[in-house]
Amino acid sequence: MTAIVDIAAREILDSRGNPTIEVDVTLEDGSQGRAAVPSGASTGAHEAVELRDGDKSRFGGKGVLKAVENVDRDIFDALSGLDAEDQVHIDQVMLELDGTPNKGRLGANAILGVSLAVAKAAAEASSLPLYRYVGGVQARVLPVPMMNIINGGAHADNPIDFQEFMILPVGAPNLKEAVRWGAEVFHVLKGALKKAGHNTNVGDEGGFAPNLPSAEASLEFIVKAITDAGFKPGEDIYLGLDCASTEFFKDGKYVYEGEGKTRNLEEQAAYLGKLVESFPIVTIEDGMSEDDWEGWKILTDLIGKKCQLVGDDLFVTNVSRLSQGISKGIANSILVKVNQIGSLTETLAAVDMAQRAGYTAVMSHRSGETEDSTIADLAVATNCGQIKTGSLARSDRLAKYNQLIRIEEELGSQAVYAGRAALKALA
């Protein structure tokens, strides 16, 4: 009854107006699953390959018709008749069919679209919500949202070198209230930026991109907005950074073009340590560049006990890179992006490896998103306790928050909001 009878892919548009792939999977009993694949702006060099057409006459070469064709032909031929409930086998068949270490032949976007759609179809056939189908009866922890409210770096056209400044409403009693707290801070911040003469248009992920001179200036604006919204910084709401340091790592140095400063490895670590001392920062993502293992070690030794250090470009949701990091004592958390690795099975394996090693895991969106809210379900399915899915603007971001609100409501008294317990630095 759960045999795959049809797989159909199409080219749709993401939140930046770029093409991406959407896949529908139909099972013998009529159950269907649909998944749309996201895309990143600042991508790690070690990520799985997103297959683009390269035909400059369509979408500036960004079309995904080759990936669509790979789904409709090769992948469908390989999966037709297989049991959708055997997710591990289905993903393995696709990996073997691709035959490359980085999914470069079929495309990680093609493989992931099918992988997620198969899981959704199987969940429907089982009459279970996706989070319950993937996570079982223990799936009940609602994640702390890491809300990106000021943007810089590759996500904005302003002098700020760091890519994201986030708020984490850990003190909220539940997920729904956490979202409300975040929204209220967001609106207070908007008013403050406007009053100070800054542009309040929003960027790719719904955050503001004001012309502020430094990271410190951005953090000061956010701390004041938290206070003015009636919350306590460092108690109700903490701060987080995504430095995306790979983007400004040049010739072994960290070059802050916006600030006109250059820092070596030790100075970069010391600078981040100073920010943690000066502001209620509880998590820093990609504080060092993706292959700067030495810098990562310096940073981890310096502040790893008091701050969550998240590897995104460093680990790229890849178990082999994560295991290297664990063995070297580098970072203490992994950012989990389904399209960095390209299949549900491998995504879950990365979360499992992190949790077994005592690392935290943060489920994450990409800057190019769609209305697909799968990652909300996966955050609950894995009980990872943290989700990063943008600001409190743009429906491609809100789709995930709204899905979490629905899941919390559905779980009722079983639901647990992760709160402070999600972050070991606060435990």
Curated annotation (Swiss-Prot):
It is found in: Cytoplasm; Secreted; Cell surface. Its cofactor is Mg(2+). Keywords: Cytoplasm, Glycolysis, Lyase, Magnesium, Metal-binding, Secreted. It is an enzyme of class 4 (lyase). It catalyses: (2R)-2-phosphoglycerate = phosphoenolpyruvate + H2O. Mg(2+) binds at residues 242, 285, 312. This is Enolase. HAMAP family: Enolase. Pathway: Carbohydrate degradation; glycolysis; pyruvate from D-glyceraldehyde 3-phosphate: step 4/5. (2R)-2-phosphoglycerate binds at residues 163, 337, 366-367, 388.
